Amino acid sequence: MNTAERRNEILNLLQNADAPVAARKLASQFGVSRQVIVQDMAVIRAATPGILSTTRGYV
């Protein structure tokens, strides 16, 4: 899975989630480091209004 595909999947997961999703959980699910997820989320949040970062995860 390339970066763009991973980011699209993350966005899909967040849009369908009922609760905040932790970066640690996303990292495990996609087989990447938490830092990669943090970087992905910075790009996703810049391009997608309404995505928030909380102490419990992303919503």
Q: Can you say where each PLM-predicted feature lies in the sequence?
A:
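Intrinsically disordered, low-complexity sequence elements enriched in Ser/Thr/Gly/Pro
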Residues: 4-5, 32, 43, 54
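Extreme N-terminal segment that seeds HTH/winged-HTH DNA-binding domains in transcriptional regulators
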Residues: 1-30
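HTH-adjacent hinge/linker in prokaryotic transcriptional regulators
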Residues: 42-59
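Key DNA-contact positions within bacterial/archaeal DNA-binding proteins
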Residues: 35
